[in-house]
Amino acid sequence: MTSQEKVPLQVQLSLPQILSRRDWENPQITQYHRLEAHPPFHSWRDVESAQKDRPSPQQQTLNGLWSFSYFTQPEAVPEHWVRCDLAEAKPLPVPANWQLHGYDAPIYTNIQYPIPVNPPRVPDLNPTGCYSRDFTLEPSWLASGKTRIIFDGVSSAFYLWCNGQWVGYSQDSRLPAEFDLTPYLQAGSNRIAVLVLRWSDGSYLEDQDMWRMSGIFRDVKLLHKPEIHLRDIHIMTHLSPEFTSANLEVMAAVNIPSLQLNDPQVTGSYQLRVQLWLADKLVASLQQPLGTQAIDERGPYTDRTQLVLRIDQPLLWSAEQPTLYRAVVSLLNHQQELIEAEAYDVGFRQVAIHQGLLKINGKAVLIRGVNRHEHHPQTGQAIDEESLLQDILLMKQHNFNAVRCSHYPNHPLWYRLCDRYGLYVVDEANIETHGMQPMSRLSDDPSWFSAFSERVTRMVQRDRNHPCIIIWSLGNESGHGATHDALYRWIKTNDPTRPVQYEGGGANTLATDILCPMYARVDEDQPFPAVPKWSIKKWIGLPNESRPLILCEYAHAMGNSFGGFARYWQAFRQYPRLQGGFIWDWVDQSLTHHNDHGQPYWAYGGDFGDTPNDRQFCMNGLVFPDRSPHPSLYEAQCAQQFFQFSLLSTTPLVINITSEYLFRESDNEQLYWRIMLEGESVLEGSQPLNLSPESSQCYRLAEKLPTLNKPGQLWLNVEIRQPKETPWSPAQHRSAWHQWRLPQPLFSPSSDLTNATAHYAPQLQHNLQLQHDLQLQQDEQHIKVTYQQQCWQFSRQTGRLAQWWVADKPMLLRPLQDQFVRAPLDNDIGISEATHIDPNAWVERWKKAGMYQLQQRCLSLHVDHLSHSVQISAEYGYEFEQEPLLHSHWVYRFDRHGRMTIDVNVRIATSLPAPARIGMCCQLADISPTVEWLGLGPHENYPDRQLAAQYGHWSLPLEQMHTAYIFPSENGLRCNTHTLNYGRWTLTGDFHFGISRYSTQQLMVTSHQHLLEPEEGTWLNIDGFHMGVGGDDSWSPSVHIDDILTRETYQYQICWQYKV
């Protein structure tokens, strides 16, 4: 047969002829000549290699350097490029996004499409990447069988040529495109060419909240299959009601030439064998010929068979105990010789919704989930195994058991790793039309049905053999249309073993088995007109509603956020049908960029000149781009921990521990406990933890509380560690912790802050000598209080402590003064698009009220001589446009020990929105390498985000007191502090503090972390009260009322001392 007889006529079309059809603007054309979807194949030629998952010689990677040429539109590509490289071509790695290699620009938008909305049309100026590479095939490779090329991910559409002949076309950026290259190949050197379009009609279905980039960004490989080969394999497990036995059901289809399909003697000569292995032990085996199961009165499918193996006492798979078997499916010829084998990891597990509860192996599961985009700061959407594994290990270490593939099918290796390490997965179709108006515009349009359908059905066909996948998702934020209902029914018919979820149209349509709202709040209704978001507690109690509720997105972790997260987990544990959710989201989607000096920094929307853009809204992660943790990650870890604690009594000291594991014995846990006195251990111990799943046990720690030789507050700290390393954690990994303030201290602590009875001296005289060298000097401009080498100097004009001298050295660069504002958080700004400003956002309310432009006046200044101290009282008024807004009254007391105690009373006008903080700030001249404190720590914490913080004595380098959020904002607070030591400074009281080299003003005006410049000295913020950070979402005020400063008056007290 001649080459031309082998090749379909279409490949004879020229490049201009192919492009003139504009397939990328036709939603009913999603592919030409692409092979049907199936699970990943390796085509092993021996069973042992398949069973042990060895590299297959039948696969050949095409990753590496390709030749690349860039054009602004496809019509500009020279026709001869399909046969030979262009002179201007340069090497480009595959996989990669070309925008990260100097071509075109990445674009970050959330909702708004990056192109004019005119579906299915896209701009004529359509960036186009022309890839090519040569590869060599030995004659033996081509002697028999078929060769396929597999593209695991190309954005957004592409055409393929081999040796100058057109092979096919495909779109859908996140699923494999596989083509038969057999007719086009030759022994020796071969050339493939790929023309990739940035925009296609598929781009209207890929409007996810992410960087919009393009190119061949996943693996490319060749696969050699025999002429007769396995075409599809579907593996299901069915467990008995008592979970004591299971059936392994394998449905396999074989590719047989069509002329032989109706010949039972031919098809019956091929046999399928399934062998099930547990490690190196063969557990079960079954073999039978094709075409043995009658389908109807006309007989069986002659190219398929179904094998069912019974397994007694199977070891079950769960995220807690991800026990995997290995199923080897072999195709044999009539002589019982192996033609080829495929193999898959198998987990025996059951997913069901029963009595309103999502259950895994009969147990109601609490989803400790997170949304995850495929993102790497250097390589963008090209993710390697090291990065995938890093994410999984971090998730497991921080008590996550589930991940939602937001919002598209992930790299095939992701699912294998989730199978092996144990994470429940929501696999989501690559569909989002958030920028459409209405969102359901395309899902209700029959001409788009094929485009929608293939993205759902091909995902299921590729991924359905993975035990980690417990839920299918129809996509994200695409409204609710007839297409969704049809695809829901398709999944339920083709995979009845898993539920389906879909949030669009209000999270409770007939196209979802699970109520899966996003950003619904615990107790607060959001009654939007078309799709109301009820509080999660209310939602599960609505009439005729019996489905479980699992939030598909919640706790928007944008920047300094995540306030109120613990409230969700209180509700999850209280109401069984509230079964958890998926935090938004895992990683800050920032890309590494370089400034004019070649220095790298983390960039966000707009930094690449990209238009439109949504600025920093891409950075919502629990981890920074390099996977270092945000403080909020610890909050998630603590709230989601699998052990819960309660204090039963103090004499004897008894606690109760409850295991929330459903399947796992606590056979690698050690309980450690300590009784702490003001941060120091006075009694401690440890013992093994032996808890069965879902059980509780009491632990007697001590017969009584210890006798102390000094006063103070006692605390009981407990934590659980894993003595041995696990596949996902190192030895001594801390998995759970808790702390109690014990009911009563053994002594009543003395306080330097208690107001002693004041004995006023006779009339104050200038230059008066007080006891113990405490001196007072006054003139028309200043008031000075001196003690030994220290001098406190007040300005009569401002009423402020203008300077603190020590041995004639100034200690203050900026005076001590009130502080009522903070550098706005993303949650304070309250916007989801760069062009929309929410007038209800906190920052807008503060701006309108004049909080950032307050005019300060000293209303009064009085000096009093007491018997053992000097007292200075000052009143300050703050107004905006002549309207009084705030009034503060400071009382300074200087005592015979060289201490300055400040009592602050603040009164707030009823017309003023609640301030961000009630506190003070100053700029210290000193820079000390270390900060020590007694209070909540060690990481950053805020009034509504302190579940994971513990009271204790902490010490950190100064630079670690600043949290380097990429978009600068208020950060670094430590709450409930009683003592702060910084260099020679000591502060005592009950306060929150933040300390760094950056002022609030600089944080307010700087757009990126790398642009911050350390200032002279150290900025110290002391807060008596601080508003919460919020975090239910980031586009509406989300700080809970309990964490808002709503009172009219506030009072706090601080004692300062400098150790000379």
From Swiss-Prot:
Position of the signal peptide: none
Taxonomy, superkingdom: Bacteria
Catalytic activity: Hydrolysis of terminal non-reducing beta-D-galactose residues in beta-D-galactosides
A biological process term (GO) from this entry: lactose catabolic process
Residues annotated as binding Na(+): D209, F617, N620
PROSITE patterns xrefs: GLYCOSYL_HYDROL_F2_1 (PS00719), GLYCOSYL_HYDROL_F2_2 (PS00608)
Keyword Transport: no
Annotated site location: Transition state stabilizer: H373, H407
Assigned EC number: 3.2.1.23
A GO term from the CC aspect: beta-galactosidase complex
Entry cofactors: Mg(2+); Na(+)
A GO molecular function held by the record: magnesium ion binding
HAMAP family (UniProt xref): Beta_gal
Subunit structure: Homotetramer.
This protein's name: Beta-galactosidase
Organism of provenance: Yersinia pestis (strain Pestoides F)
Lineage of the organism: Bacteria, Pseudomonadati, Pseudomonadota, Gammaproteobacteria, Enterobacterales
